[in-house]
């Protein structure tokens, strides 16, 4: 079904993207947040197809993720699968110029999935928020099955396994205010090579469960650090 669907490649502006890295990273984030702590950047794959799977806590997420994992850290530009709401307004325009494309989080279209598969087939780094929507209660919510299905479908068409990178975004406030704190914890990647892609339904369920467990472990580790 995906093979017959058309996809339009997301756009990464050669002029705007490096400018936004400097503007967002060096000015906006550093001035807005009192501290932005990052752990686990050594886990980021420097090559090959990878899905970055962050928790979703704020509209700041789409700005923080490239700053802590993108071209300045890994040498890679990131593509984004984001909700239609996040493609609205000035932020949406910027995201659209920097690799973002919309997806219906309740019922992803075939064309959106096709775009994701094509990006991974080309060895790109794709950001997918597995919870689907923004949740501000600092709890890990049930994951949508789309990420696992996308990864496994891409794995069937690639010459190498797809890596899935769990990322925890933890804000000190539900609605981050000026001078607040944020912590980003990056876990060890999962690999589609550990799942039987010839049984896609059970493999997707297993991968989704493993990703949920990985995010929960990052959350538990963050809680233990706070108690220490």
Predicted regions and their residues:
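Generic preference for hydrophobic
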Residues: 38, 52, 80-81, 164, ...
């Amino acid at each position: 079904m995906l093979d017959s669907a058309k996809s339009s490649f997301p756009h990464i502006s050669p002029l705007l993207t490096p400018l936004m890295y400097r503007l967002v990273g060096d000015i906006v984030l550093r001035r807005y947040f009192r501290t932005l702590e990052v752990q686990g950047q050594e886990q980021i794959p420097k090559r090959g197809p990878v899905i970055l799977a962050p928790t979703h806590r704020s509209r700041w997420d789409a700005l923080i993720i490239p700053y802590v994992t993108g071209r300045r850290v890994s040498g890679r530009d990131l593509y984004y699968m984001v909700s239609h709401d996040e493609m609205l307004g000035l932020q949406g325009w910027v995201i659209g110029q920097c690799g973002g494309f919309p997806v219906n989080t309740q019922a992803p279209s075939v064309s959106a999935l096709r775009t994701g598969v094509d990006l991974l087939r080309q060895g790109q780094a794709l950001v997918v928020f597995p919870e689907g929507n923004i949740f501000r209660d600092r709890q890990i919510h049930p994951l949508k099955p789309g990420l696992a299905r996308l990864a496994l479908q891409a794995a069937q068409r690639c010459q190498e396994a797809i890596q899935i990178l769990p990322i925890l975004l933890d804000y000190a406030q539900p609605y981050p205010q000026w001078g607040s704190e944020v912590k980003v914890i990056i876990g060890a990647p999962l690999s589609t090579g550990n799942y039987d892609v010839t049984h896609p339904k059970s493999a997707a369920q297993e991968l989704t469960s493993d990703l949920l467990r990985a995010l929960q472990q990052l959350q538990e580790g963050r809680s233990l650090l706070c108690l220490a």
